[in-house]
Amino acid sequence: MARCATRTGWRASAGMLRFSSTCQGTWPNAPAFLSVPSSTTILIPKRSLFVLPFGLDVGLLGIGAYYCTRLKKPDPVNVMSIFGPELGSKEAEANPDQVVQCIAHRGAGLDAPENTLEAFKYCVERECNFVELDVRTLKDGQLVVLHDQGLQRLSESSITDVTALNWEDIKDIDVGVTHPNRQRYKEVKLCLLDEALTYLLEKRVRCIIDVKGDNKEVVNGIVKTFETRPALYKSAAVTCFNPATLYKIRKMDPKIVGAISYRPYCFSAQDFDAEHGPTNPRFGDNLPVHVVLRFLDLLHSLLWRWTARWCGVSAVLLHKDTVSLCEVRYWRTLGVRLAGWSVNRPVEKLYWRCVLRAPYLANTLAGEREKEKEVQVDTQSARANESAVKTEKQEKELA
């Protein structure tokens, strides 16, 4: 602290202030107050030599907090048990039956009513041992397997918010009346998460649990489900679009294998594809809100990879139109699995199998076994051609 004595008078001495090193913060012609006694001192703080530029200290603090609070990944053995060996790896060549190529999105929702026991049974019949399902909480705290917040799309019901209802209120609603195969699937009901997991574990079907909502009940419900069913640690992964929700779940139980889901414009638009871009805006009639959501989309696109690593994820589930070979290599270097959704066209499935060499989530299982045979034949023929070329080179060298 610098110490400077104030003189009585109308103006301070300019000469003293000009050559004094202890009063650098005082103006040369600053007026002095008559009422101030001559013995009064004014304390002037000096600027520290270690003060960081504006914003740099906040940035360093944020980086430190990021690395201090980042969660660790779960046991790699559990990750391997769920997702199997990576395509193209030595483990995959040694154990081709354990390679995951197709994951039934919502239990193959185009072939059977989505997120129902009938859909999961259909997957078992089609020899698909990996499904994805969605989970929400009800008013009574139970976890129901359901994607939408309402039931208008799946049934003729006018219910718009199931979180305000109990299980007894919706358990008898037919959710297959609007499905394309409704003639085959009649009187299809919703199911609770416990019912679905009981069946899937019995049939040794692995699953990805997509958590919908960010309330405390769903977080506690997922953690409790894993605690009561230890087999899930090696057969189920938890995913979410909201990294904060996934962080809460994995912080409460770090043994849970986590995955982050991502697609562009998830804040401002309900749908997205590469051909049409973002469609069906959430607040299209409110321009200020729409602009704010677009800004959040921009921040999300810049930060979602950091938030994924912050949550200690073992896999990322990306919209198929955002995935490239560079994206696949990036996550493989980090030891993180990548899967795309939703890949339904036969040509797209072959592209994912043969070029990207990564698993995908599909709404239909039509032709999956045939594609696997085609890929196996192509792989065998490619290896045969390579061996033939090597043999020819060796013969030429010997000759």
Where are these regions (language model features)?
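Phosphate-group recognition and catalysis centered on beta-loop-alpha active-site segments
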Residues: 2-8, 12-18, 22-399
